[in-house]
Curated annotation (Swiss-Prot):
Keyword field: ATP synthesis, CF(0), Hydrogen ion transport, Ion transport, Membrane, Mitochondrion, Mitochondrion inner membrane, Transmembrane, Transmembrane helix, Transport
UniProt lineage: Eukaryota, Metazoa, Chordata, Craniata, Vertebrata
Top-level taxonomic group: Eukaryota
Organism whose genome encodes this protein: Canis lupus
Main location: mitochondrion
Membrane topology reported for the UniProt record: Multi-pass membrane protein
Name of the protein described by the UniProt record: ATP synthase F(0) complex subunit a
C-alpha cells in the first residue's frame, strides 16, 4: 500500500500515544531543575561528571583558553543529549545529518583559528611551515598544511555523522533480521535479539563517546591557537 505524500510529516506514535510528548519531556526528566542546589544523587552525579569533564578538557589551556569553558560544556551536553534522544523509537537524530554537524564544526573551528591569528599571529603562521624544512619543499608543505587546516572541520563533522549513522543502520538491520527470523527459527531470532540488545547498549556508549570526542578535538584546536 502506498503511503500518504505527507506521511513523513505526521507526528510519530506508538501504541496510540504520541512520541513527541516523550521526546519533549525527556530533557527535563534527564536534567531536572531542583528547588535547591543539590537535590538528589542524580544531580550529584551530573555535577560530578560535568566537573570531571571540564577539568580534563581545560587542564591543558591557559587563562585565555579557559574562557571557552561554558561553550565546550554546552557543546558536549548538546551533542550527547541529541545522540541519546535519537535512540528513542520513532525519533530522528539530527547528528546523522552532515549539514548540521558542519554547521557546528565550521563556526567552532573558525573561532579557534581566528583566536590564534588574533593573539598568536606569528605562531599560527609558523604552523604552515615546520622548522627545518628543506628549501625546495617549502611551497609544497605550505599547501599541504593549508589543506590539512581546512580539512579539520570536515573531519569533525564526518566523524560524528559516520559513527552515529553506522550505529543506527546496524540497529535497523539487526532489528529487521530479528523480526524476519521469528517465523523461521525462534532460536536464531532469540540470539539475534540478544545481539540487538547488546548493540543498543553499545550505541548508548557511542552516543556519549562521540560527543566527548567532538568536544575534545575542538578543545585541542583551541589549545593550538591560544
Amino acid at each position: 500500500m502506498n503511503e500518504n505524500l505527507f506521511a513523513s510529516f505526521a507526528a510519530p506514535s506508538m501504541m496510540g500515544l504520541p512520541i513527541v510528548v516523550l521526546i519533549v519531556m525527556f530533557p527535563s526528566i534527564l536534567f531536572p531543575t531542583p528547588s535547591r542546589l543539590i537535590n538528589n544523587r542524580l544531580i550529584s552525579i551530573q555535577q560530578w561528571l560535568i566537573q570531571l569533564t571540564s577539568k580534563q578538557m581545560l587542564a591543558i589551556h591557559n587563562q585565555k583558553g579557559r574562557t571557552w569553558a561554558l561553550m565546550l560544556m554546552s557543546l558536549i551536553l548538546f551533542i550527547g543529549s541529541t545522540n541519546l534522544l535519537g535512540l528513542l523509537p520513532h525519533s530522528f537524530t539530527p547528528t546523522t545529518q552532515l549539514s548540521m554537524n558542519l554547521g557546528m564544526a565550521i563556526p567552532l573551528w573558525a573561532g579557534t583559528v581566528i583566536t590564534g591569528f588574533r593573539y598568536k599571529t606569528k605562531a599560527s603562521l609558523a604552523h604552515f611551515l615546520p622548522q627545518g624544512t628543506p628549501l625546495p619543499l617549502i611551497p609544497m608543505l605550505v599547501v599541504i598544511e593549508t589543506i590539512s587546516l581546512f580539512i579539520q572541520p570536515m573531519a569533525l563533522a564526518v566523524r560524528l555523522t559516520a559513527n552515529i549513522t553506522a550505529g543506527h543502520l546496524l540497529i535497523h538491520l539487526i532489528g529487521g533480521a530479528t523480526l524476519a527470523l521469528i517465523n523461521i527459527s525462534a532460536t536464531t531470532a532469540f540470539i539475534t535479539f540478544i545481539i540487538l540488545i547488546l548493540l543498543t547498549i553499545l550505541e548508548f556508549a557511542v552516543a556519549l563517546i562521540q560527543a566527548y570526542v567532538f568536544t575534545l578535538l575542538v578543545s585541542l584546536y583551541l589549545h593550538d591557537n591560544t
